[in-house]
Amino acid sequence: MIKLRLKKYGKKREVSYRIVAINSASRRDGRPLEELGFYNPRTDETRLNVPAIVTRLKQGAQPTETVRSILEKAKVFEQVNG
């Protein structure tokens, strides 16, 4: 199963995340199928490749709870359903 989850990167205590499509059996920082965006929790900065995310969701990818809340803030699910 394909999951949309956060991949950790950055320096210690200055962590950022990439939003990636990855096989659910892979490690958190394993090789992703596709990088779909960026999230920095310190500044609350988010950059998303919305068309690619919508495509992955329509293919059946399941977002984790954290990624789901990021996508809800960006109103990505409205584009999937409508």
UniProtKB/Swiss-Prot annotation:
Write the protein's name: Small ribosomal subunit protein bS16
The record's Gene Ontology biological-process terms are: translation
Q: What family classification does the UniProt entry report for this protein?
A: Belongs to the bacterial ribosomal protein bS16 family.
Task: Please provide the record's keywords in A-Z order.
Answer: Ribonucleoprotein, Ribosomal protein
The cross-references to PANTHER family, in alphabetical order and at most eight, read: 30S RIBOSOMAL PROTEIN S16, SMALL RIBOSOMAL SUBUNIT PROTEIN BS16M
Tell me where on the tree of life, at the top rank, the source sits.
Answer: Bacteria
GO terms, molecular function: structural constituent of ribosome
Tell me which GO cellular component terms the UniProt record holds.
Answer: cytoplasm; small ribosomal subunit
InterPro entries, sorted: Ribosomal_bS16, Ribosomal_bS16_dom_sf
Q: Does the keyword Ribosomal protein apply?
A: yes
SUPFAM superfamilies (alphabetical): Ribosomal protein S16 (SSF54565)
